[in-house]
């Protein structure tokens, strides 16, 4: 392993943000076993898991630590994700402060119907805990372990991953640096450099863009329900979610040509009420928004997920619409497969894990893509839906809540399929 400096804090005090010491590597390349591109939750989780396994790693992130922590994302964790956080030594706060959920509610035709996730899935549940908090916990764990994260690394470029000696170059404080490594893990998201570094002829991309978005609002108000409410209405989809007992996250389906700034808080709350059942509408507590944004919805998969000594993980390889709460969980399962493969490589000198990484990931990815597409198609109003389509959706929802077989299928997928399926 390479010697590493103790963690330093930048002027902001964000954990793991290095403000000095980088210039010393300007002429002599750094060396690590695994170079991780991206310090979001998937990159940080992989870094912690590798560290626990005695595998050296350095993370490069093009944004600042503050920017990474400022991203508002999903907040529903499957048990597999919780187990990986535990293995990484970063689950203490998620266990203490996360909200275990044993069910969800489906709202259609003005009435709510509960799906017993726990009872239908053989005792599994999900945990509501914001991605921002997951990221914060992993950043703090990495800093406490003295591991190297280089934030604001510009012009990151990947080299030689189709051979035996890959490397990564980047610019920091105006100087170009080289990081030599055994493997590169691309955890830098849909717009990151990792997937774009692969020749177009070597990758096949599948994509579906949905004709609507989600207008989301974050507010420090108690949730309207202790479990999530998914609403199908003639006005469009709505979701009542939460981050804690005092912070709520709400969404309404909107058109792609709308802008968040055109929606006042009052207009949002009024529209949400119109999409809820009378009891929920009456109990809804409103307040000023902490954050308001519109997110487009898409399904996307890039195949394969391994290119020589480069591995893609998380949003770098696949995107799901947020309806099924699968994005962060898929990223975590990718990381789990890669962690296992690299432990096998370094511990047993076996290529079996890395050779089957892409196949294992994609088998799980496509099942989650199918579920997310199905749930999105069922709950949203499409331009072509019309009165007939609305009736079909309502009939399917009615079947779903009355049929134990159908409810079980929903529950199994929502809480997360087994890792070996």
What residues fall within each predicted segment?
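Active-site-adjacent segment of FAD-dependent monooxygenases/related oxidoreductases
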Residues: 70-74, 78-145, 159-162
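Conserved FAD-binding catalytic core of PHBH/FMO-like flavoproteins
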Residues: 140, 147, 151-157, 161-297, ...
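Conserved mid-domain beta->alpha element of the FAD-binding
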Residues: 37-52, 138, 293-374
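C-terminal helical "tail/cap" subdomain of flavin- and related membrane-associated enzymes
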Residues: 8, 17-30, 325, 340-421
């Amino acid at each position: 392993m390479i010697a590493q400096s103790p963690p330093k804090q930048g002027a902001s005090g964000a954990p793991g943000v290095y403000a000095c010491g980088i210039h010393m590597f300007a002429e002599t390349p750094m060396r690590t076993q695994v170079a991780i591109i991206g310090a979001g939750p998937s990159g940080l989780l992989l870094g912690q898991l590798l560290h626990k396994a005695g595998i050296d790693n350095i993370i490069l992130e093009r944004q600042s630590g503050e920017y990474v922590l400022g991203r508002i994302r999903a907040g529903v964790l499957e048990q597999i994700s919780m187990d990986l956080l535990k293995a990484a030594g970063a689950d203490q706060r998620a266990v203490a402060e996360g909200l275990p959920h044993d069910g969800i509610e489906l709202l259609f035709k003005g009435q709510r119907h509960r799906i017993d996730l726990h009872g239908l899935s053989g005792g599994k549940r999900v945990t509501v805990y914001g991605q921002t908090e997951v990221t914060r916990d992993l950043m703090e764990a990495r800093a406490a372990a003295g591991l190297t994260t280089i934030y604001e690394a510009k012009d990151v470029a990947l080299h030689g991953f189709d051979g035996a000696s890959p490397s990564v170059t980047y610019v920091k404080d105006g100087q170009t640096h080289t990081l030599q490594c055994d493997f590169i893990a691309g955890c830098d998201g849909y717009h990151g450099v990792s997937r774009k570094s692969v020749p177009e002829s070597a990758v096949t991309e599948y994509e579906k863009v949905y004709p609507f978005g989600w207008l989301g609002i974050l507010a420090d108000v108690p949730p309207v329900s202790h479990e999530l409410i998914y609403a199908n209405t003639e006005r469009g989809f709505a979701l009542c979610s939460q981050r804690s007992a005092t912070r709520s996250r709400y969404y309404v389906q909107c058109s792609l040509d709308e802008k968040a700034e055109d929606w006042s808080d009052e207009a949002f709350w009024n529209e949400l009420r119109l999409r809820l059942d009378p009891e929920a509408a009456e109990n809804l507590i409103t307040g000023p928004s902490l954050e308001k944004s519109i997110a487009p919805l898409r399904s996307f998969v890039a195949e394969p997920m391994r290119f020589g000594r480069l591995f893609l993980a998380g949003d770098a390889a696949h995107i799901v619409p947020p309806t099924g709460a699968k994005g962060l969980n898929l990223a975590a399962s990718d990381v789990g497969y890669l962690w296992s493969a690299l432990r096998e490589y370094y511990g047993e000198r076996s290529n079996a894990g890395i050779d089957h990484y892409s196949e294992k990931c994609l088998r799980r990815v496509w099942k989650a893509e199918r579920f997310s597409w199905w749930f999105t198609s069922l709950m949203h109003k499409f331009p072509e839906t019309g009165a007939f389509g609305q009736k079909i959706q309502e009939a399917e929802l009615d079947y779903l809540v009355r049929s134990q077989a159908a409810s079980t299928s929903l529950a199994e997928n929502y809480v997360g399929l087994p890792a070996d399926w």
